[in-house]
């Protein structure tokens, strides 16, 4: 059981992230549903968690932005005292061959996928 644990799930407004958030809540964790796109979809995830007897909130944060991640983690620690579980689920793709991909698209993929993990874990590790 995860009762008393706080979990942050990135990209939790839909798909795999939503399923992970629902499962963590089912096991007793308080879940922070991170999203960057649809607030409505994130709120639907929170509502589904609450309807199943769990507890959750939604928080918008572009995980490719280091400063935004630092601010989100600091805010969560201030509000909830500790974050015990981090599920780095957020990810994007730009469907094109690397040789035809625009630099901005490449940067967005790299900054959201592997780099965001550092953005989210570093502020916590340095505490």
Task: List PLM regions with ranges.
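Conserved glycine-rich cofactor-binding loop
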Residues: 6, 13-14
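Conserved glycine-rich Rossmann-like NAD(P)H-binding loop of the short-chain dehydrogenase/reductase
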Residues: 29-44
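Substrate-binding pocket helix/loop in short-chain dehydrogenase/reductase
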Residues: 97-98, 102-110
